[in-house]
């Protein structure tokens, strides 16, 4: 007997029921929130009276869940005490709540009708593959892997996929392998479908089927048929076949390749096809590729796929994406050579920009193009520009129509069966979304060019400030130098008639004055300053231009209309056998026209950006040369100033020497010496001495002592006069060598 479902808003202690998350074969899963703490828990409760076997299976799921701990397997948690009671003789199961919903919800979105984006596919394969390995290592087979049993959770900005619903899981430690199963048939491995013995490889089949659906938007083998129908048709397929479809004639076709369209780059497609061939092998023994180094080969190949370093480069001159598998330690130059071979743009003309407008560093390896942890060309791109071009002609030819789309465009009123129309319209939605994404990527490339321009403008501003500062300093020094040399020349003229003079020095000073005028020309930066200001104005105008902002609103609106049409078609019953594509074709045509218009504007604006950037590139060497000239002029001016100061100090030394000489001569010259000599002669004549001796009665020794003392003094005075005359002759200004002035 079925238990009535829990009503929305039901209260269980502090826990309020907020939402019903899902209903399974035997249970309901509801979201509860604690009013006091805000904590969220997913509570699974039994809605049916179970048989003894199913009660065991229910309790087994709880036991399995409680012992598992892996980021890609949903965690069991403690049941709140208020809910710790039996329902239909089985307990509740409390689990972590994953707010992103399940994978089926994601796949059902119209934008994913032809598969998920590459980054989403790779992220999902990595997560679910890791979860399956963990279960198998713990000897647990899930047996019911499907999109409904994969939930999504945002964690630190990254989507994490978790496996849920282990109700059908088989614990290998609990007995022999079971041969009966009642899980979802569309994802069921052939041996389970046929009630044959099975192993862990049943999860490989389900995993491969689910991965294929995430890539293509539909299951790999005759997805429109019921399992009982396609099973007989597919069982004889080759082990490398990963895709089967029915043609209009009813003939079944097999393929070893993924169908188009999908969102994978060519490098990933090749690897994924090989990987799917291992998972979708009909033979359960061969499925997974056997064991290599203690691990199934399919997981070894997964590791190889996720270790690939792939750089995706958008050629802005052709709007084409080029993907390159980087070798370990590959240099940037080697990568550029490979780019040249594919694009025809020579390495010297290649400019590779990251999303933020930063140029790649040629000193670093090519792996700088790849961010660790980021996978998929839809999530990270490098933009290629041709430096030899400043005008990008665009727009370019839109992506080509598939055969199906071309068919309905040629005749939009042709009536097609609803199942076939769904596929054609899914391709139409993918095409419209693709045109919008093409524009978005090109706009991102234009934005990278703008950011690069702003970086160049920042360098230009710095160099301009350096130039202006150097020019102002030179001008100030020139003004000082000119004024000081004017004063020096005036003072020199004033004193040369009666003081020191030198024609060589005067000529040298006047030459300095002339050179200073020439140095002033080095500091003339008005033309460059005006040019730079004009570029600044041009850049501001480019930033303010409407083309600097996304112009894809019309395309986004058309994309939404295409998705709405597809959504309206999807639930229609096949009983309404046929319909035309008139409305969808209108959207296709309008989208192509809209893309052509916005691309014309985009490439026109991009050409202006690149032209402005080239002006800066051409201007930078001129500024650098001007700064160097100013610095050289500044240095020469300072050398002249220092030289002139040395001359002035030398003149001062001469003047001081002459002044000292004159003072000495004045103090000990002829007149004083004569007077002193006369006085001495008067006092020292023999008659006076004898008179003094007579009058004062002095002895002969006193007389001799006095005569000797005066004789010494006379010699000293004579020597001093001789030295003064010699010094004056040696320091005569007119006889000096002024050749050092020209050094």
Swiss-Prot record:
<comment type="similarity">
    <text>Belongs to the protein kinase superfamily. Ser/Thr protein kinase family. I-kappa-B kinase subfamily.</text>
</comment>
<dbReference type="GO" id="GO:0008385">
    <property type="term" value="C:IkappaB kinase complex"/>
</dbReference>
<keyword id="KW-0067">ATP-binding</keyword>
<feature type="region of interest" description="Leucine-zipper">
    <location>
        <begin position="453"/>
        <end position="474"/>
    </location>
</feature>
<dbReference type="Pfam" id="PF00069">
    <property type="entry name" value="Pkinase"/>
</dbReference>
<keyword id="KW-0547">Nucleotide-binding</keyword>
<dbReference type="InterPro" id="IPR011009">
    <property type="entry name" value="Kinase-like_dom_sf"/>
</dbReference>
<feature type="binding site">
    <location>
        <position position="44"/>
    </location>
    <ligand>
        <name>ATP</name>
    </ligand>
</feature>
<comment type="function">
    <text>Phosphorylates inhibitors of NF-kappa-B thus leading to the dissociation of the inhibitor/NF-kappa-B complex and ultimately the degradation of the inhibitor. Phosphorylates 'Ser-10' of histone H3 at NF-kappa-B-regulated promoters during inflammatory responses triggered by cytokines.</text>
</comment>
<dbReference type="InterPro" id="IPR041185">
    <property type="entry name" value="IKBKB_SDD"/>
</dbReference>
<dbReference type="GO" id="GO:0008384">
    <property type="term" value="F:IkappaB kinase activity"/>
</dbReference>
<dbReference type="GO" id="GO:0045944">
    <property type="term" value="P:positive regulation of transcription by RNA polymerase II"/>
</dbReference>
<feature type="domain" description="Protein kinase">
    <location>
        <begin position="15"/>
        <end position="300"/>
    </location>
</feature>
<keyword id="KW-0539">Nucleus</keyword>
<keyword id="KW-0963">Cytoplasm</keyword>
<dbReference type="GO" id="GO:0033209">
    <property type="term" value="P:tumor necrosis factor-mediated signaling pathway"/>
</dbReference>
<dbReference type="InterPro" id="IPR051180">
    <property type="entry name" value="IKK"/>
</dbReference>
<dbReference type="GO" id="GO:0043123">
    <property type="term" value="P:positive regulation of canonical NF-kappaB signal transduction"/>
</dbReference>
<protein>
    <recommendedName>
        <fullName>Inhibitor of nuclear factor kappa-B kinase subunit alpha</fullName>
        <ecNumber>2.7.11.10</ecNumber>
    </recommendedName>
</protein>
<dbReference type="InterPro" id="IPR008271">
    <property type="entry name" value="Ser/Thr_kinase_AS"/>
</dbReference>
<keyword id="KW-0723">Serine/threonine-protein kinase</keyword>
<dbReference type="GO" id="GO:0005737">
    <property type="term" value="C:cytoplasm"/>
</dbReference>
<dbReference type="GO" id="GO:0071356">
    <property type="term" value="P:cellular response to tumor necrosis factor"/>
</dbReference>
<feature type="region of interest" description="NEMO-binding">
    <location>
        <begin position="736"/>
        <end position="741"/>
    </location>
</feature>
<dbReference type="InterPro" id="IPR046375">
    <property type="entry name" value="IKBKB_SDD_sf"/>
</dbReference>
<dbReference type="GO" id="GO:0005634">
    <property type="term" value="C:nucleus"/>
</dbReference>
<dbReference type="GO" id="GO:0042803">
    <property type="term" value="F:protein homodimerization activity"/>
</dbReference>
<keyword id="KW-0597">Phosphoprotein</keyword>
<keyword id="KW-0418">Kinase</keyword>
<dbReference type="GO" id="GO:0046982">
    <property type="term" value="F:protein heterodimerization activity"/>
</dbReference>
<dbReference type="Pfam" id="PF18397">
    <property type="entry name" value="IKBKB_SDD"/>
</dbReference>
<dbReference type="GO" id="GO:0004674">
    <property type="term" value="F:protein serine/threonine kinase activity"/>
</dbReference>
<dbReference type="GO" id="GO:0005524">
    <property type="term" value="F:ATP binding"/>
</dbReference>
<feature type="binding site">
    <location>
        <begin position="21"/>
        <end position="29"/>
    </location>
    <ligand>
        <name>ATP</name>
    </ligand>
</feature>
<dbReference type="InterPro" id="IPR000719">
    <property type="entry name" value="Prot_kinase_dom"/>
</dbReference>
<keyword id="KW-0808">Transferase</keyword>
<feature type="active site" description="Proton acceptor">
    <location>
        <position position="144"/>
    </location>
</feature>
